Each structure stands twice: as C-alpha cells, then as structure tokens.
C-alpha cells in the first residue's frame, strides 16, 4: 500500500490491486467507502467461489477501481476469457515512479494492452488528478472498454448535483431492497419506482436500498456531492467516458454486503449497460487501438469551498477540479 499527501488531502493506493485507491482523506473526513471486513474471505486467499462475479465481490472492500479492459459481465473476446469488470483491478502493477504527492503505475492485461495510471495531488489544494493511457503492443487492432469505479461514503440524506439527461434502470433484479423499476427509463433526477410513483435520485435515501442505473449520453462530465459539511466533486474526460453508471448499495442483505455497506458510486464509463466488452464490440461501443497506438483519458476528484447547503447552485466542475 502506497501513500500520497500534499498536506491538504491524502490518498492510499494499492499497487497490488491495479492501483485501487483505498482512501481519500481530508482531515478526519474519509470520502470513499472503506470496509475493513474480515469476511467474506477473498478468493485470492482461499479458493474460487465458482463465479467471476462472486470472486470479484469477495475481494471488494469499497474504494476506487479502474475497470479495464472489460467492464461488466465476464465474456470472451478474441478467444481470451475476460473476467467480470476486467482483470486490471485485480492485477499486481509495476511502480514506475513514486514521489510524495505523485505516483505512476502500469500493468499489462490478458489482451496485448498496457495501461499506465498517474495519480497526482495538486500542491496545496484538495485536488486529485488521475491521468491514464492505454497502448497496443500488438500488430493487430485490439478492442477495449474502460471505466472508473469510485464508491463514495455519502451519508444518508446527502444531495447529488448532476446535469440533466436520460436514465435507464438496469433490467436485472438487484435484491429485495431494490426500489427502482427494472428496465424503466427517466430523466435525471427522477425514475419510476415499483408501485407507480417516482424516485428522486438526487438525494441519498434514508432507507436501505439497492439501485443500478445508467445515465447514458451525458451532456457534461461532472458531478457534485454533499458529504457532511463538505462538497466533493468528480469530473472526467467525456470523450473517454460518455456515460455514467449510478450504483447505490445501502444496507443490502446479499453477498458480500450482509447489511454492512453504504455506497453511492458515480462511475464514468465508456459503455452502457454493463454487458461487457464482447457486447460492446457487437454494439459498436468498444474502442479500438491500432498497432502501437495510445489513447489517454483523465479524471479529477476535488473538494469545494462551496457550502453544503448551496450544492445545487453548482453549474459545473472543470478538469482542474474547480467548481463553477
């Protein structure tokens, strides 16, 4: 586990798990969901659960993963089996460089792709900049999809500010606490519930719930969230991540949560729904890299000076992490 700090905020990055960000802290505030669970036992420390999804979930303890070169369902591409959410997030990376407030890691994948990620804390500011690039080391065009998977620890009742846009609720049943209607559509912030009413997704509910929605074809790449007395934000490269997965797991009873999780995940993504790379190739949503080609993307996390009560007055968050 590697630590970075600029004197204002600090982060912890697990170089042995694809550069997963385990913590983003400012003073006593921890902005990411971070679970120190002894169970369920991780598949890597025991044996497989017989499912790529369950194996991935057995390792999950919150935090911020990168999904690459697959996101969503396990599938097979070019004869290569790709696990749920891609193998990068469960891969031991190489540390290219490490400074007090900057870290560079890289690793290859099952496909002939290499992903390099740079984490930089802006001097004297509560801003984390993530830059990444993927290169094709083969002599053939190679497809991929990617996404960011940050799970935030937003308290119940917190407000979420996002640009308006279309929503699709995932068609699958998430669990007994799902309150959104599977397969329904809406416009941010409202979607149909299961009994003929409407649900406002811009407020983290007080009740236990489970939700997965796709805020597809985003008009702008940013979100602002109330976290106690603070306002946090995330902005992203809209060309790399034109869609957003919106996932909430609050008090869910199933594996691996068992009622212990409180997660609101705002996930910039290159595809929707979460069908995986094989489906993205068929639907035309996959990116392709030519031999030797490199593609880059950025994501920024920041903490605002805007008062929590004024969160809905925010009009945008730019690539530098500045709120407007």
How does the language model describe each region?
Residues 1-129, 140-145, 150-324:
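Surface-exposed acidic/polar loop and edge beta-strand patches at domain peripheries
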């Amino acid at each position: 586990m590697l630590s970075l700090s600029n004197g204002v905020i600090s982060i912890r990055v697990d170089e042995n798990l694809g550069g997963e960000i385990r913590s983003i802290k400012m003073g006593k505030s921890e902005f990411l969901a971070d679970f120190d669970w002894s169970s369920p036992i991780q598949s890597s420390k025991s044996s497989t659960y017989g499912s790529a999804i369950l194996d991935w979930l057995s390792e999950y303890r919150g935090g911020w993963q990168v999904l690459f070169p697959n996101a969503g369902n396990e599938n097979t591409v070019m004869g290569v089996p790709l696990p749920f959410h891609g193998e990068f997030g469960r891969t031991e990376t190489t540390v290219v460089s490490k400074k007090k407030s900057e870290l560079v890691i890289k690793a290859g994948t099952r496909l002939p792709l290499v992903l390099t990620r740079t984490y930089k804390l802006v001097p004297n500011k509560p801003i984390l900049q993530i830059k990444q690039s993927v290169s094709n080391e083969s002599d053939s065009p190679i497809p991929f999809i990617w996404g960011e998977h940050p799970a935030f620890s937003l308290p119940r009742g917190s407000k979420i500010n996002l640009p308006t846009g279309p929503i699709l609720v995932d068609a699958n049943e998430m669990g007994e606490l799902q309150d959104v209607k599977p397969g329904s559509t809406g416009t941010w912030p409202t979607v149909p519930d299961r009994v003929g009413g409407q649900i406002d997704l811009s407020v983290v509910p007080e009740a236990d719930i489970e939700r997965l929605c796709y805020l597809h074809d985003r008009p702008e790449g940013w979100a602002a969230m109330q976290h106690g007395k603070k306002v946090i934000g995330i902005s992203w490269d809209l060309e790399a991540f034109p869609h957003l997965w919106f996932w909430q797991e609050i008090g869910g009873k199933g594996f691996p949560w068992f009622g212990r999780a409180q997660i609101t995940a705002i996930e910039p993504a290159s595809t929707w729904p979460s069908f995986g790379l094989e489906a993205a190739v068929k639907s035309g949503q996959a990116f392709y890299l030519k031999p030797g080609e490199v593609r880059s993307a950025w994501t920024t996390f920041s903490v605002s000076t805007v008062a929590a009560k004024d969160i809905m007055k925010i009009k945008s968050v730019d690539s530098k992490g500045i709120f407007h």
